[in-house]
A protein has these predicted regions:
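Hydrophobic alpha-helical signal peptides and transmembrane signal-/tail-anchor segments
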Residues: 12-23
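Conserved beta-strand hairpin/beta-sheet module of binuclear metal-dependent hydrolase folds
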Residues: 21, 26-74, 112, 175-177, ...
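Active-site metal-binding motif and surrounding structural segment of the metallo-beta-lactamase
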Residues: 65-116, 144-146
Length: 204
């Protein structure tokens, strides 16, 4: 059941540890599970992290310890990752951030890295960035939000990302990835003029 603030639209959904992603049907959609473990490390599971590939734009959801190692194994291009979404401030969902941020700096990244999270992450990470990541070639931009209500936290010309309030021991949310409706490319007058059969319209 969707939160009352989320429109009840037709979407596919994927259940992940703590985080729930809803996505509409898109031209290209890939989900890479980098880690699905809990707080205690094991030899078989990395801590929680997923990467969504939407039309070759990469969006990371949570960044547990070891996320960047798994990112390399998945052969995903670091340069296409510009937005990271953190569901809540437990360590197994964000301990991998510092290593990833540092690696981006060593690789000579220049594009901004946007980190979206519940309130409190910037306060936690700012001293670490100031100590370990001085004079980086790029800027880390924090975007903090309230998890009590759905909030639009990302938008481009083809899609939006909205938070979904979730119940957990601390403030927590999932993320709704939704494709924007495309403009109608069928001109009714031309359909009538050329008498295009209805069964052919789906192919246009």
């Amino acid at each position: 059941k969707l939160h009352p603030g989320i429109k009840n639209e037709r979407v596919h959904f994927i259940l992940l540890p703590v985080c729930i992603i809803f996505v509409s049907v898109m031209e290209k959609f890939e989900l890479h599970i980098l880690g699905c473990g809990s707080a205690l490390p094991t030899t078989r599971h990395f801590a929680t992290s997923q990467v969504v590939n939407l039309r070759d734009k990469l969006f990371m959801i949570d960044c547990g310890e070891g996320a960047q190692m798994q990112l390399r194994k998945s052969r995903l291009k670091f340069s296409r990752l510009n937005h990271i979404f953190i569901s809540h401030l437990h360590g197994d969902h964000c301990f991998g951030l510092m290593g990833l941020i540092s690696t981006f700096g060593l690789l000579g990244r220049t594009a901004e890295l946007h980190i979206h999270s519940p309130k409190g992450l910037e306060e936690l990470f700012s001293p670490l960035l100031a100590f370990f990541c001085k004079n980086m070639s790029y800027q880390v931009v924090f975007h903090e939000f309230d998890t009590k209500e759905p909030v639009l936290i990302y938008e481009d010309r083809s899609m939006t990302v909205t938070t979904i309030p979730l119940q957990h021991r601390i403030p927590c949310c999932g993320f709704l990835f939704a494709e924007k409706p495309r403009p109608n490319h069928i001109i009714r007058e031309m359909i009538d003029f050329y008498q295009v059969p209805v069964y052919e319209l789906n192919r246009i």
